[in-house]
Amino acid sequence: MTKGMLTQGETVTLKVDEKNRQLTSKNHSATHVLQKALRMVLGSHVEQAGSYVSKDRLRFDFTHFQAMTKEELAKVEEIVNDQIAAALPVVTKETTIDEAKKMGAMALFGEKYGSTVRVVCMGDFSLELCGGTHVSNTAAINCFKIISESGIAAGVRRIEALTSEGLIHYYEKLSADLAEASAVAKTTPDKLTERIETMQGEIKALQSENEKLKNQMAKDAVGNVMDQVVEILSLIHISSPRDRSLSRMP
């Protein structure tokens, strides 16, 4: 419902947005795999500090003391995509909080849970307490790509990532931007980096030449001024009274 009012006793129809739910579930399941991958790469000190999932993207905040390296990010991506390719079954079950802890299920730090909780198990890879929507198999996530990693607070990092259709749209946009940049640089996408490096060299050479010309022009200007000063001083010298009297002597 986007506008209007509901009154008591009115009949309504509820309908799930299947496409939205499907894409959201892919991103949600990806956060579970991501958290386990982060703990494997960075250490067991990593804990979830917040998250956001939508049909377009996912965001995962976690505890860590420094920025991740390119190698660490690449390793995390590799692990997540390996688990997607492994087509792990995703199973949910309700159990007691004590039983879930015995199973080794990860819980959100500071979260209060009731006596009955929902456990989401992804093969032998991930086991977490969660009440959200998920895929039935990790293969449904399709693919995973980290697009940014940044710090948001002391000891808290943030990863933003894409999966499935969101990642496809991202690469389509990159491809279009690359084609446009290549056209401006008068080259092809596969040679754009080489072309940019060549242009940077040309710009550097032009800047150096421009600096030389500016210095030469400054020297020439100073030389011209000095010539004019000498000429003026000569005129002043000749036109002085003593010089005129000397010039009339036999």
Label every PLM stretch briefly:
Residues M1-L14:
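Conserved nucleotide-binding/hydrolysis modules and their immediate coupling elements
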Residues L14-N20, R57-Q66, A161, L233-L235, ...:
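Short, hydrophobic beta-strand segments
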Residues K26-R39, L129-N137:
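Histidine-centered catalytic micro-motifs
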Residues H45, K55, T138-S239:
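Terminal appendage regions of diverse proteins
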Residues I236-H237, P241-P250:
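Single conserved hydrophobic/aromatic residue that forms the stacking wall/gate
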